[in-house]
Amino acid sequence: MVKVLGLVAILLIVLAGNVLSYDRQGTRKNLVIHPTNEDDPTFPDQVHISLVGPDKMRISWITQSSISPSVVYGTVSGKYEGSANGTSSSYHYLLIYRSGQINDVVIGPLKPNTVYYYKCGGPSSTQEFSFRTPPSKFPIKFAVSGDLGTSEWSKSTLEHVSKWDYDVFILPGDLSYANMYQPLWDTFGRLVQPLASQRPWMVTHGNHELEKIPILHSNPFTAYNKRWRMPFEESGSSSNLYYSFNVYGVHIIMLGSYTDFEPGSEQYQWLENNLKKIDRKTTPWVVAVVHAPWYNSNEAHQGEKESVEMKESMETLLYKARVDLVFAGHVHAYERFSRVYQDKFDKCGPVYINIGDGGNLEGLATKYRDPNPEISLFREASFGHGQLVVENATHARWEWHRNDDDVSVEKDSVWLTSLLADSSCKI
């Protein structure tokens, strides 16, 4: 049956026009990860957590049979003074796949910088997990990596990230690379569970989450929206495809490259209102995240609508709001730009960083444009991850760590000053 599903998926990819037009190198094989306990259909599988408002956490997991979605939690292992109930759902994809029961439970209020122990499904569950909430003071530490996938390189990246004591993981789109072959979503959930069950993972979608097939499956983002529910309602958004959240001192805006972004569209109006509501006294740093990069000197993905037209539509909004950083994925390489606005250096513009280098099966985008544009300060086609440490209201440090023969090597680093600290860039 698995072979049949694989052949169907390959055929559908071709029919959908999802054929790459440039060479990829440095691939490693994809992983297949089975459930930890296949004998127990109620055993929690693919556990991950995400932030919900200032003091709550969403616990998400999958079971193979129907259960009452509930979570018990507490600050001492084995002692659970808190409990909460949630919702469950599932989905079909074509006629050949049905997901397990996807459970979502929001717990809280929670204390900052505190370890909580929890069980999915109630106190009788045999598996205990734990997570730590983000702190309520600086420094704040973000791990960043996009285009992750389920390859051996993906596993290597996650192993490097796990050795760093970060607070929140940010993924700028292209999660599982299921490409319509739904069992890869399950493998992805199991691959990231050791990290995603311990720290909040905040994600946005990419082109590989679309999974739309004319006539056969007309509803895009089915798996993504069901499996990775983000706090969109809490930020006034009407769609799981774009939202915002706060971690102490930092406002983060997760934008949708593959949904409406034209002036006057719902996302545009939401972004406009969201930016107006930012209190720079309490959140002096503002970070935006997209999938398709607005600046890119790699040969890959040049001239795509989602990059060019979204930039034309929204760049000025971010510039006028003095957004400090913009992360993107899509291009399977690393690149850091200077502060930019309208294709030129501008000290009041955001720093743009492309980090679609998580390790997916497609490999690396190794061809760069020559000569190197002046605004591109560092570029390298290697897998890896980034570390953003917001030290205080005015300064942050960015590091990019390359996966080098399975050893994490720091290759690029820079100190950043908040635009709020520059008197000439005052809003």
Swiss-Prot record:
Any coiled-coil regions, as ranges: none
Protein's cellular compartments: Secreted
Principal EC category: hydrolase
CDD domains the record matches: MPP_PAPs
Residues modified by glycosylation: 85, 392
Binding site for Fe cation: 147, 174, 177, 332
Main location: secreted
UniProt tissue specificity: Expressed flowers and siliques.
Catalytic activity, EC: 3.1.3.2
Name assigned to this protein: Probable purple acid phosphatase 20
Organism: Arabidopsis thaliana (Mouse-ear cress)
